[in-house]
Every structure is written in C-alpha cells, then in structure tokens.
Amino acid sequence: MSKNIDWDNLGFGYVETDYRYLTTYKDGKWDEGGLITDANVVLNECAGVFQYAQTVFEGLKAYYTKDGHIVCFRPDLNADRLNQSCERLVMPTLPEGRFLEAVKEVVKANKDFVPPYGHGASLYIRPYMMGTNSVIGVKPADEYQFRVFTTPVGPYFKGGAKPIKIRITDFDRAAPHGTGHIKAGLNYAMSLYAITDAHSKGYAENMYLDAATRTHVEETGGANFIFITKDGKLVTPKSDSILPSITRRSLMYVAEHYLGMTVEHRPIHKDELKDFAEMGLCGTAAVISPVGQIDTPEGTINVPAGMDDMGPITKKLYDTLLGIQHGEIEAPEGWVVKIC
C-alpha cells in the first residue's frame, strides 16, 4: 500500500523511508550485510570519512512503469562507476552483484514510497561508501561501510523544464589527472562556493572550463553538457576530468539508434558555444535541463532555441529517454531492470 504522501506536491528533498541497506568491510572482506531501520550513522570522531573525505556515492531512481512494475535504469553502470571511484580513493570495491542486490532489497523494502505511475515523481536511491575507522595520519582507512538509502522525490522541474541561464565561471572544478572523473564527495564540496556565488548573481549553474588551458568546455558542478548543432548533430564534451554521466551515455545511444542523429563525442572549444542551436545539462535528477543563455567573459550568448521552452531536438531526446525508462518505448536489452 502506498504511503500517505501528497505525490502531486512532493518536492525534491529528503523524506526518511523505513529501511536502508548496510554492509561493513573489515579485516579485508565484506560481511553479509542486510536491511536496517535506523537512519542514523554513528561513527568515531576520527573516522576517515570525517578527517580526509574518503567517501564516494552514486545516484539512481526507481519508479513504476505503465504496466505496474517497479524498475531501475541501468544500475549496473552505477555499480561500475562506484568501483572506479573506490579504486581512485583507495577504497575496497564492491562486487556488482552485491551492489545490485542491495539496491533491489532496499527498493523492495520501501516499495510503498515509490510514487504512483504518471506523477513524474520517483524513489531516489543513494548508494554510498565511506571510511569508518579512526585515521589520524593521512592514509586510507582500514574499515568501510557501504550503505543505500532511498527517498521519494517529486519531479525536478515543477510545471515543465524551462531553459536556464548559466555563466562561464572563473573557478575550476577539477585538476588535470585529478578526481574529476569519479563521483567523490570532495568534488561536490569544492563546487559549493562557486554555485552559491552563481545563484547570488542570478545564474542557475556554472559552466566549468578545463583547468589546464581554460579553453574547453567541461561540465557543471553536477551535470554533463549536451549540444545540438544547427544541422542536427548531438555533440558532447570529451575530457578525462569529466564525470562519465550515465544519462549522457544513454542520450548519445538514443540520439544515434532511435532518432538517427549523428553523434560526436569530442573536445569542445568555448568559441563554438555561439554556434550551437540548442544546449542542455543532463543527469539523473532532471534528465535534461535546457540552457537558454550563457554569460561569458566576451559577452552574452543567447541560444537560438530561446528561453521559453526546450529546443525541439532536445525535447525529442528527453521524451524518448523518458519513454524508454517508463516502459512506453521498447528499451535496449538490459537497460531497464525489474525490481518487483
């Protein structure tokens, strides 16, 4: 039975659910793990996660399809990306099967928090890992916890996705050969000052350039960019310091195999921005957030698609991917994983 939640007015925030998953790594191995009810995490004051930010995380969603099943979208890619993040921060990896089973268990246990089909809402899933034993010298922790919690969230955009205004920022998101390609908490902490500053000046997001030359487009603090050329190609930035977005990867496939578009994954010079017909940010939360205006050091770029609605090609990409996720359009094999 669904929880007594006003699904039509559900915001995008944290709502505590009944169960979460926990498994502990100690003496070189993971324990059996399982569901728990306590939403609090109790750790020593000197835990590695507190002292040296040794934590990584993922984000995905569960939702009802039109035929009444609860599903997740490409969770195997989240498992793989989590392990890439773990390896970079000298943390133990988690077998893909354990990751997928943890996600399935916690979603099944909280199925009453999955919003009904058609509301645009979903059950957000947050897997994360952290160093838990006391570490006073700068070194990796020896003990870790992998946890998964869930929270029901409303649609990222109430009333539809309207184009946003962003800026090219002077701040750097990630250094060459740094940690920009992984989903680590430290990367997001570094972006907080820049996004707070952007919001105070009327911008929804920052566009980061590469730190080495400050000439090529990277991403925002939490989303990848997609661009549509005037002749209908999908172009996405290529860089070793960009987080490999699962949504972007999926949109590239949809563009080529469902919409017959030419797809280019390559470095994008900032001087090209004025020539694109449509722009957007992509990620798990919003899928696509259209961009209508960019303020640059050289002046303002008004995207031809405008500030009123999502551009026509971006809208096709958005609608097609959403249709795949919700069972309205046939999905490639393995993309949509049934939970129950």
Place the predicted regions along the sequence by residue.
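Short, Gly/Pro- and small/polar-rich lid/capping loops
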Residues: M1-T37
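Conserved catalytic-core subdomain
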Residues: S2-G11, V15-T17, K158, A212, ...
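Extended Lys/Arg-rich, glycine-bearing segments that form polyanion-binding/interaction patches
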Residues: D6, P75-N78, N83, L89-K201, ...
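Active-site-adjacent loop/helix segments that line or gate small-molecule/cofactor pockets in enzymes
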Residues: Y14-Y25, G48, A161-L209, I313-C340
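Short acidic-glycine loop/turn motifs at beta-strand connectors
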Residues: T24-W30, V56, Y63-G68, P75, ...
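Conserved phosphate/anionic-ligand binding catalytic regions in large, soluble enzymes, centered on
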Residues: N44-K61, A285-S289
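Flexible, glycine/charged-enriched surface loops at secondary-structure junctions
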Residues: E96-G97, F113-S122, N206-L209, M261-H269, ...
